[in-house]
Amino acid sequence: MLGIRVIPCLDVTDGRVVKGTNFVNLKDAGDPVEVAKQYNSDGADELVFLDITATHERRDTTVDLVRRTAEKVFIPLTVGGGIRTTEDIRNLLNAGADKVSLNSSAVKDPSIIKKASDKFGIQCIVVAIDAKKTGEHKWNVFVHGGRIDTGIDAVLWAKKAAAFGAGEILLTSMDKDGTKDGYDSELLKAISSSVVIPVIASGGAGKVEHFSKACEYGASAVLAASLFHYKELTIKEVKEHLKSKNIPVRQIRAEFAINN
């Protein structure tokens, strides 16, 4: 089994990292380049960089900010927000992104998933799903930063995205986002059991035990934002906890250097 990835998420708007609860009440959490540099040093396996208002405001993700971030970090960087065409994807990859995250544009036109994976490789294409519970064992897909209910069933959409060529799913529970009371186990199990591609769990991490629970529910990677931004937990603490539960993790680079 491959090591579970521990991934901080940088939600960015107006050039600043922000964090809120249930996708609203955003608070400033720092400069994205400086925050990314710190996570790189702290042993994060990857970074997710989401311009959370780019699609809603119909503006492009700031390629310059991506370039400046990529120059300072040496771990895989996934970038999303306002990506509508394969040319947008090319520009971000050329700026230093390793992967791109498609959300609203993929829901509007699923063929962009196939076009992108054919052109750039399946390993570059992440489909982000923002899901909210709408009934018993049912979740709908929301787009435009969680503002619009598409009426699309999240499990069916995950299957479709995988069939079109998504390399992995970034699954965010809107109900759990920012609450710190744990990942949405029911949603995570429903999605991870319906696809064969990796699923990144997002939304709700509040204590170290939540990360191991997400792995039990089928997550291939665990993502958090405010916990890490506000130093309530460190990457190292999460990895040590996972190891204590016999869940394989990737070594922090300092440990790797010592052991070699």
From Swiss-Prot:
The pathway where this protein functions is: Amino-acid biosynthesis; L-histidine biosynthesis; L-histidine from 5-phospho-alpha-D-ribose 1-diphosphate: step 5/9
- GO biological process entries: L-histidine biosynthetic process
GO molecular function list: imidazoleglycerol-phosphate synthase activity; lyase activity
Organism's domain of life?
Answer: Bacteria
Quaternary organization: Heterodimer of HisH and HisF.
HAMAP family, per this entry? Answer: HisF (MF_01013)
What this protein is called in its record is Imidazole glycerol phosphate synthase subunit HisF
* The gene coding this protein: hisF
